[in-house]
Amino acid sequence: MDVFACIFFFGWAHFASILFFAWVELSTHFLLSKEKLPMNKTRYLTQAAIIAALYAVLTHMQNLLLPGTTTWAIQMRISEAMNVLAFFTPAAIPGLSLGCLVFNLTYAGTLPLDFLVGTLATFLAALAMWKTRNVKIGKLPLLGLVMPAVTNAFLVGWELTVYIGGGFGINALYVALGELAVVLVLGTALYFAITARSLDKSLLALD
C-alpha cells in the first residue's frame, strides 16, 4: 500500500508541476505582452533552460557539500543570487521558477508542498524584480533586490509554520534573513559583474 501511495504521490506531484510550469510560462508571456520587447523565441527558451539547469545544479551541489543549508528555516541557497538575472532578461522568470521546481522535486529533504510553494515564491520574486528593474537607488535596483526575501518570507514562512510549527513571524524572519544575506551580498556582486562587463547586452540580450 505504501508503494502505491508513493507512486500516486510522485505521479500527482509531477503532473501538478507540469501544469504549474505551464501556468508560469503563460502568465509570464501575458504579463510581459504589453512591453513589446524585441525577443528571439529560441534565445528566450535557451536562456530559460540554461538558467533553470544552473539553479538546480548549484543547489544540489551546495546540498552535497553543506547538507541542509538549502532547506532549513534559515536557508541560504547560493543559487538564489541568480535572482538578479531577472533584472536583465524576462527569461529568468520561467528559468528560475523551473530550476527551483526541479530541485524541489528531486531532493528528498524538501517539504511536501515545497515544489509548489517554493516555486510560486520564486516566480513572484523574479516577476517583481523584472517589473522593478528600473527603480534604482544610485546604480542599484534595491527595491527589486528585497523581493525574494519578501515572497519567500510569506510563502515559505507559512509552509514552515504548517509543517514544522513555531510562530509564523519567526519562521518568516528566518527565511527573509537567509534570502537577504545571499541576494544582497552575492546577488549584488553578480549584478555589478554583469553590468561592468556589459553581459546584459551580449549573453542576456534577447534580440
Language model regions located:
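Membrane-embedded alpha-helical hairpins and interfacial helices in multi-pass inner-membrane proteins
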Residues: 63-72, 101-127, 131-207
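Short, Lys/Arg-enriched N-terminal segments with co-localized hydrophobic residues
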Residues: 23-38
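Short hydrophobic targeting helices and cationic amphipathic motifs
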Residues: 10, 15, 21, 30-31
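Hydrophobic transmembrane alpha-helices
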Residues: 39-87, 91
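Membrane-helix interface "capping/anchor" motifs
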Residues: 85-96, 135-141
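Small-polar-interrupted transmembrane alpha-helices in polytopic inner-membrane proteins
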Residues: 55, 96-104
